[in-house]
Amino acid sequence: MGKYNLILSEYLSFIYNSQSAVQIPIYYSSNSELENRCIEFHSKCLENSKNGLSLRKLFVEYNDVIENATLLSILSYSYDKYNAVERKLVKYAKGKPLEADLTVNELDYENNKITSELFPTAEEYTDSLMDPAILTSLSSNLNAVMFWLEKHENDVAEKLKVYKRRLDLFTIVASTINKYGVPRHNAKYRYEYDVMKDKPYYLVTWANSSIEMLMSVFSHDDYLIAKELIVLSYSNRSTLAKLVSSPMSILVALVDINGTFITNEELELEFSNKYLRAIVPDQTFDELNQMLDNMRKAGLVDIPKMIQDWLVDRSIEKFPLMAKIYSWSFHVGFRKQKMLDACAGTLKTEYTENVDDEMYREYTMLIRDEVVKMLEEPVKHDDHLLRDSELAGLLSMSSASNGESRQLKFGRKTIFSTKKNMHVMDDMANERYTPGIIPPVNVDKPIPLGRRDVPGRRTRIIFILPYEYFIAQHAVVEKMLIYAKHTREYAEFYSQSNQLLSYGDVTRFLSNNTMVLYTDVSQWDSSQHNTQPFRKGIIMGLDILANMTNDAKVLQTLNLYKQTQINLMDSYVQIPDGNVIKKIQYGAVASGEKQTKAANSIANLALIKTVLSRISNKHSFATKIIRVDGDDNYAVLQFNTEVTKQMIQDVSNDVRETYARMNAKVKALVSTVGIEIAKRYIAGGKIFFRAGINLLNNEKRGQSTQWDQAAILYSNYIVNRLRGFETDREFILTKIMQMTSVAITGSLRLFPSERVLTTNSTFKVFDSEDFIIEYGTTDDEVYIQRAFMSLSSQKSGIADEIAASSTFKNYVTRLSEQLLFSKNNIVSRGIALTEKAKLNSYAPISLEKRRAQISALLTMLQKPVTFKSSKITINDILRDIKPFFTVSDAHLPIQYQKFMPTLPDNVQYIIQCIGSRTYQIEDDGSKSAISRLISKYSVYKPSIEELYKVISLHENEIQLYLISLGIPKIDADTYVGSKIYSQDKYRILESYVYNLLSINYGCYQLFDFNSPDLEKLIRIPFKGKIPAVTFILHLYAKLEVINYAIKNGSWISLFCNYPKSEMIKLWKKMWNITSLRSPYTNANFFQD
């Protein structure tokens, strides 16, 4: 503890360095005598500062508080006006400002011109192309960097080099910004026309990216990469990231494999010492040299040289530098184009009649057959999900935009909103709700568009379709996904697997007579050719399925689904262009349908099968695996003879020629040793992930608060760090300080302490130790957690008013009545709460809640409420367990090879000692018998929290719960009377605890918790038969051991002597654990 608080104190003296500035620390304690001293100390501090007296004497007088109590927050006063950043910046602005080359980008507005040249008037101006979309400002970012630099100017040795590298890069940034002045943001952290008009348009987003990069510089290589990207991204806002990351798709094919991990029959990773040579035809090197040439043409010097130097040996040892370049390229920021250009890219696809009809037919048939295969069983058995598809759709209706703003009446309140869920309610109330009619999206009612921005790729468009499309597709798509879940070809959906499993799949079949074909089909998805054959394949499949059933409701579901496909074959989109709204015919597939992911995978599989069936006419091979994963597909082909350069050359050219015959603009490559797809790449038999999450620029604005964004920032930093891109932790902590501080008045600000931000309460933002989730068990920690729980849920007047209106009530009642066969308060209340929670995406409500949250927080941070909550948290459970464990030193040898080279050393060490896991631990209760029983008869999906509540009820209440959801009485009776029920109790508790302990997030998801090597460090004598207690004791012990190893790089063993008398008490407590949602858990979830 304490590192954060120390930096916080230094940061405050750095920011408020004038005479008038005062810092008042606020302490608290769970000990009532000490707590009184804390209160006295605080009031005397306020008294003294009001009278302009020094606080130094008080610090001595109240030494007991400072020594023994816990810091709660720091209150800072400053009467200084705000030109502080500019003043400090001058000191660093000693270099030559960058001059943007205004001819680099094809589109005029992507050149970094002075804003008033791009937008002559305030009316024309938009910040949408450069909006950092994050609730922190450029001035804060500059402050954070300057704070770090000032703090480290006296570093020595290796640290001094880091300081000098960063100082040098910051000089470039500071000089450029200083030339134009620091742009001031408004209250919403946006940059308005008056501020920007005389400055380069992309100044802010470029500076944010540059700061993010320079604060991630450690080595000399980092420095060279960063410098080049910082300088060039000032001018090149369009293609830089793409140019720098392109070579990777070829580099992965150049590294020999000397030992790798493969997936065995039990789906575990197993080391295999196979040696495989990378066989590379000359043509591949020509293509690579072409890419390096393009990089040099764009002004890159050092990066292409690094790649060139690596090519001499092509060793896996030096490959992490290539991985680093690949990751860094994304940190130049998002490419944000105008919607018109985003559409143009996909619409200008060259259309030709000169295509191979035979292949198209095959492609369409494969899609048709796959759709039939996926849905055959549920349709034949008149599955209840397909019968009640409308209700299922309503229950999972999102609160995203429905494409247009409407005036809605809720009781006496009239509001304007675009949200789907509100539109459904309003339509029902006004008898406009007609899910049986799918509105057309033709020239009369074109589709409004959303956008998706990614670094290094062009902006993609998203359809915002009317909610009827969602309702029509939901149930059918769910059934498709269930099929995909147990079909290994669908890497993305395959049951509880993670990326490591897919990695072992690829390496498993590689040998000297195989090659792997990998294709990026993202262009194919949006090419006009994909519309007719694709939609027709789905329609033909649905027609076949319609003949397999006589159930009117199932037929209706299939029919509505078919209608969505027919409508979308004739689709138009609307694009605002200035004041006019352009309508453009749009043939292709865009995301925004419920089926996007599933249908894309189906089409993708059909595509690669079509291509393989063609080239099998020329070459003789066996297909060992085919996988599709999002926009990518790959296949391992096995030949009768050893693979030669010539063979690769031939296969490669044939594959490309085959794709060309379908007029598919795809990037197809063939290699013997590695692949590169969007999500991961395999080189030299090792797996790599791109560490490309931007920290100081966001893709879009949502309704998350500053606290949420601080937690997301931290979470992004952790993911990047696990993937090999490390940003200075002190800088991240400084950002968290800035983003979690609360302004009381203009000159008064409150900064929460580490304890507040790291205790798992509803306010948790980060972990005091990276990769280790701590559950505080000391008196002070539990005390503050309880205090925060007292003000967890915030009310919103608007939300209450809407929820009280008949429109809302009738909607909830309607859902309950359609779903339930008899009264069931748990479910009815659950639905009402879910619907009310969906209202949070309506801005006025989230604002209102945020205000309430902040005022409660302000009170709390100045003096914790003495509140004895009776709720039990996971902390209480662990606190009960802790005293019964004794620790001793232990030793575990390193026994596994590295396969993820980018991991931080301390995490790598643990995997090398205890092994990794290739599966997700089930933490949602879906595998339990009760969950399966419910889904067999009902479309309702209870959450893990609800299952946990239900399974601990009396048996007859469980029966009633089941019967009300339409489970036949005989099944409900059988369930409660069987052994399965008691197994379920244990199983659901297990899932619930795993869920609370975030076992599938952060670096915990990489460790094998069932490793025998880990088990042997834990000794717990078996007493009595309470499996749940044994489980929690073991899990606690494993986490303790692993956390200790992450922190210290050595192992301990734990012995637990848990008294039998305590076991039953603990067991009872375990059925009353409250789950805590915080910005931190949301950020974890957000990563998914």
UniProtKB/Swiss-Prot annotation:
InterPro entries: DNA/RNA_pol_sf (IPR043502), RNA-dir_pol_4-hel_dom (IPR042032), RNA-dir_pol_luteovirus (IPR001795), RNA-dir_pol_reovirus (IPR007097), Rotavirus_VP1_C (IPR022071). Signal peptide: none annotated. Keywords: Magnesium, Nucleotide-binding, Nucleotidyltransferase, RNA-binding, RNA-directed RNA polymerase, Transferase, Viral RNA replication, Virion. Residues 501-687 form the RdRp catalytic domain. It is found in: Virion. Its cofactor is Mg(2+). It holds the Pfam family Rotavirus_VP1. Its EC number is 2.7.7.48. One of its GO terms (molecular function) is RNA binding. GO terms for cellular component: virion component. SUPFAM superfamilies: DNA/RNA polymerases. GO terms for biological process: DNA-templated transcription; viral genome replication. It catalyses: RNA(n) + a ribonucleoside 5'-triphosphate = RNA(n+1) + diphosphate. Transmembrane segments: none annotated. Interacts with VP3 (Potential). Interacts with VP2; this interaction activates VP1. Interacts with NSP5; this interaction is probably necessary for the formation of functional virus factories. Interacts with NSP2; this interaction is weak. RNA-directed RNA polymerase that is involved in both transcription and genome replication. Together with VP3 capping enzyme, forms an enzyme complex positioned near the channels situated at each of the five-fold vertices of the core. Following infection, the outermost layer of the virus is lost, leaving a double-layered particle (DLP) made up of the core and VP6 shell. VP1 then catalyzes the transcription of fully conservative plus-strand genomic RNAs that are extruded through the DLP's channels into the cytoplasm where they function as mRNAs for translation of viral proteins. Belongs to the reoviridae RNA-directed RNA polymerase family. This is RNA-directed RNA polymerase. It comes from Rotavirus A (strain RVA/SA11-Both/G3P5B[2]).
